[in-house]
Amino acid sequence: MSTSKTLDHNKPFETSQTQMGFALIHQNTSANTTTTTTTGERRGRRSKQAEPGRFLGVRRRPWGRYAAEIRDPTTKERHWLGTFDTAHEAALAYDRAALSMRGTQARTNFVYTPTDVHTILTNPNLHSLIVSPYNNNQSFLPNSSPQFVIDHHPHYQNYHQPQQPKHTLPQTVLPAASFKTPVRHQSVDIQAFGNSPQNSSSNGSLSSSLDEENNFFFSLTSEEHNKSNNNSGYLDCIVPNHCLKPPPEATTTQNQAGASFTTPVASKASEPYGGFSNSYFEDGEMMMMNHHEFGSCDLSAMITNYGAAAASMSMEDYGMMEPQDLSSSSIAAFGDVVADTTGFYSVF
């Protein structure tokens, strides 16, 4: 009996132990679950989250500027992209470099359409002008800093500045051609010059000035030369009439006003006529065009002494005269003929 009582007395103790043990185990499991949840929350807090104001490949300098750089995935090297005034400009520079390296697979700060990516790859200078289609915020554009647009994107001005009309040549440039002296084997196209559209407003004044200047530089035509042989002015008192012959060949041009001019040909210009060159007589005719024409009879009273001396000289004397003989005191004192070293003479 005693044994049975002792056994019955021991049973509730065992059950209590078992209950207590179960309770302890249950408490330990709950404690383990609470510890795991708390540690998981701590780990989540420690993980770095993307800040809303930061961009990929952009760092802020202590003095306020933003630096952009990118890492090449093939060579594992960092490429410096430059420093910018704002973070948006640096982010745009990073996106341009990333798209050029990786194409559409690149991670960018902004979202781009395929057309934008193609435009950036073909012309990187236009990258700052592209607006992100999925973001209406205009702050992504570097519109607040025009210095960036000028320094890093030189083509910005070509697309946004109004095109100025091309300047035409001023109308006062071409009249300088009227002061050119005639060159042999070269015809002067005065008619084309007078009909140019740039000189349509000043044709009247230019034609008059051209007539006066060309009358000085050019000689007469062959017909007018034959008519003026008898009224040659001062040349009758110095040169015999047989020497005053028209040039064999001449090229004529006409201007807008209708006046004709001749350009002497160099083939026979150097052939002497009795010691005198052909250019001497042409220069004499050019000088007499701007003066009044006087006949030889009008000057007969002035050249009586020289006419007697010229009549006594024969044709052979003129043919044998040297250019040095013409610079004698009797002729040089008249003040019209000056001898050159080359044998050509000019009248002042």
Curated annotation (Swiss-Prot):
Concerning what turns on (or off) its expression, the entry says: By auxin.
Chain spans, region Disordered = 29-53
Q: Which UniProt keywords apply?
A: Activator, DNA-binding, Ethylene signaling pathway, Nucleus, Transcription, Transcription regulation
What's one GO BP annotation on this UniProt entry?
floral meristem determinacy
Pfam families, per the entry? AP2
Describe the disruption phenotype: Disturbed cell division patterns in lateral root primordia leading to the expansion of the proximal region of lateral roots. Short lateral roots in young seedlings. In the shoot, formation of small pin-shaped protrusions at the base of pedicels.
Q: Where in the cell is it found?
A: Nucleus
* Residue ranges for the DNA-binding region feature of this UniProt entry: 54-111
UniProt-listed InterPro entries: AP2/ERF_dom, AP2/ERF_dom_sf, DNA-bd_dom_sf
Domain of life assignment: Eukaryota
Asked if the keyword Nucleus belongs to this entry, the reply reads yes
Gene Ontology terms: cellular component: nucleus
Q: Which GO terms describe its molecular function?
A: DNA-binding transcription factor activity; transcription cis-regulatory region binding
Tell me its family: Belongs to the AP2/ERF transcription factor family. ERF subfamily.
Summary of the function given for this chain in its UniProt record: Probably acts as a transcriptional activator. May be involved in the regulation of gene expression by stress factors and by components of stress signal transduction pathways. Involved in the control of cell division patterns during the early lateral root primordium development. Acts downstream of auxin signaling. Regulated by ARF7 and ARF19 in response to auxin. Co-acts with LBD16 and LBD18 to control lateral root development. Involved in the determination of floral meristem identity and suppression of bract growth. Required for proper conversion of secondary inflorescences to flowers.
User: What name is this protein filed under?
Assistant: Ethylene-responsive transcription factor ERF086
- The organism is Arabidopsis thaliana
Its organism's taxonomic lineage begins at: Eukaryota, Viridiplantae, Streptophyta, Embryophyta, Tracheophyta
